[in-house]
Amino acid sequence: ELARQIGLSAPATADRVRRLEAQGVIAAFTVELDPRALGYTLQAIVRVKPLPGQLHLVEELLRRIPEFVECDKVTGDDCFICRLYLRTIEHLDDILSKVTERAETSTAIVKSTPVPRRLPPLVEDEHAHR
């Protein structure tokens, strides 16, 4: 399928993929699951600001809670911006209760995702438009 999409033969495509893997450009092949199909009908973005002296403990806590599917350490007033997949608002409350003992949180419920996670522009494409 990939070969057809990029207009190369299957062997040429396989060779290119192997080279990109060897160069570290392709880091992994993944499967994308639909969280809704697994019962996770709610998404939340949670900003987390650890209480004084709690930074490392909060970071470890966020790693251990599987509903935190991604979390970035950021600059600014908060230390972390995290995405959670949840089943209900009560589920959100249960998860946040584990965090609020050691951090302040600010939560936003995701209504929609107009720009889903995507790759940055490829270098070759960027030069082609100049």
Predicted regions and their residues:
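A compositional/biophysical signature of low hydrophobicity enriched in polar/charged and small residues
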Residues: E1-R130
